[in-house]
From Swiss-Prot:
Originating gene: rpmD
Domain of life: Bacteria
Protein name: Large ribosomal subunit protein uL30
Signal peptide: none
A cellular component term, taken from the record's GO annotations: cytosolic large ribosomal subunit
Length: 61
């Protein structure tokens, strides 16, 4: 299964509570924090919510 490397590039401060909760659910708490997740529709939906705050790269599993 493909993997996604998700890096937080902007702060969640000033965003909606939903955006801040989504960052936490993805495992991102600080700027430049990185997490690797499976490429699933649920994760893609979370990324869509905070697309302006994160950078997403596909990585080989």
């Amino acid at each position: 299964m493909a993997k996604l490397r998700i890096t937080q590039i902007r702060s969640g401060i000033g965003g909606t509570s939903n955006q801040r909760a989504t960052l936490r659910t993805l495992g991102l708490r600080k700027i430049n924090a990185t997490t690797v997740r499976d490429d699933r529709p649920e994760i893609r939906g979370m990324i869509r919510t905070v697309t302006h705050l994160v950078r997403v790269e596909e990585v080989d599993s």
